[in-house]
Amino acid sequence: FNASQIRDIHRSLSSSQSGKRFFTTEWEVLRDREYLWIQKKGSSQLIPELIMEEVERTPSFVIPHDKHIACLDADLLNHPLTIRKWEKGDKFVPLGMNGKKKVSDYLTDKKFSLFQKENQYVVCSGEDIVWLVNERSDHRYRITDSTQRILLIQIKKDGQ
């Protein structure tokens, strides 16, 4: 960044305008609320690889309370499951809620930065979002007393 750009970035910190972006040939800076997010320009994440394990529901099964693991009723899912970045207008029913919520509203409520929003993935069964990856499962696919088969999904990490 040159001196003029640095002054502009500094000036943006004293204004109430969030979402301002600054670019060089290699870098991008985003002013989001009271933070500056810096990212290499054009850097794109690879589509995450899913690890899926189907298990029978037994009395000893304990539902993992971990947002990094989706725990879904396997009998309610339409295969194949797909993974993609969320799109404008996408909706899901966050676990524990009854009504649909726009993914964009959910991410805003959780105070995701613009960079984080741009890199958020969803797992879909048919047209339905069943998991906002590493955030929240869809309530309609939750484990209930009548669930017999459970599908556990997580994102493959390096070395897994």
Language-model segments: residues:
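AMP-forming adenylation/ATP pyrophosphatase catalytic core
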Residues: F1-Q160
